[in-house]
Regions:
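Functional surface patches built around histidine and acidic residues
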Residues: 2-14, 18-169
Length: 169
């Protein structure tokens, strides 16, 4: 769908160039490259992915620096983190989700969550969490084995959810 849209935009730009060229017959020939068009939704998705990747790496750096094992990615945890970040961004408020639902859906024996808003990067949000006793305890908890991070932006403000877990045996 995105490829078709880009192709459509590119073809539209070419058609506009042809119409302009035909209407200016006799005028000196000039060409201008069309600026690439990137849909806002694509830019936001890429921005969220970069934010999430940055926060994931920063979290594991903090863990390793303190003798903890790095956490692996949790697909189910990522789904719930993204869902929570999206809800917070839509409401433009910060709140925790029901971790019992997350634990059940992801088959976890242990779960935790950090949430935040207003930090410009994944590194900065992890730095803030590390400065808070409760959030730092979640990040450094030895019971966790996997993590998911979701980030969404609303009106220029990032909303972030970090969900931790350990699979049930």
């Amino acid at each position: 769908m995105k490829t078709r849209r880009r192709l459509g935009l590119a073809l539209g730009a070419c058609a506009l160039s042809v119409v302009t060229a035909v209407s200016t017959l006799g005028a000196p020939a000039t060409t201008a490259a069309a600026a690439p068009v990137t849909p806002v939704s694509t830019r936001l998705a890429v921005g969220a992915l970069l934010y999430e990747t940055d926060a994931f790496a920063a979290t594991n750096l903090q863990r390793v620096a303190r003798g903890r094992v790095p956490l692996g990615p949790g697909g189910c945890l990522h789904k719930w983190a993204v869902r929570q970040a999206r809800k917070m961004a839509e409401r433009q408020e910060m709140f925790h989700q029901d971790l019992a639902r997350v634990a059940k859906d992801c088959n976890l024996s242990y779960a935790g969550e950090n949430v935040a808003y207003g930090y410009p990067s994944g590194t900065s949000v992890v730095r803030a969490w590390m400065a808070s006793d409760g959030h730092r305890a979640n990040i450094l908890n030895r019971r966790y084995r996997s993590m998911g991070i979701g980030a969404r932006k609303a009106d220029g403000v990032w909303y972030v959810a970090q969900v931790f877990g350990r699979k049930a045996r």
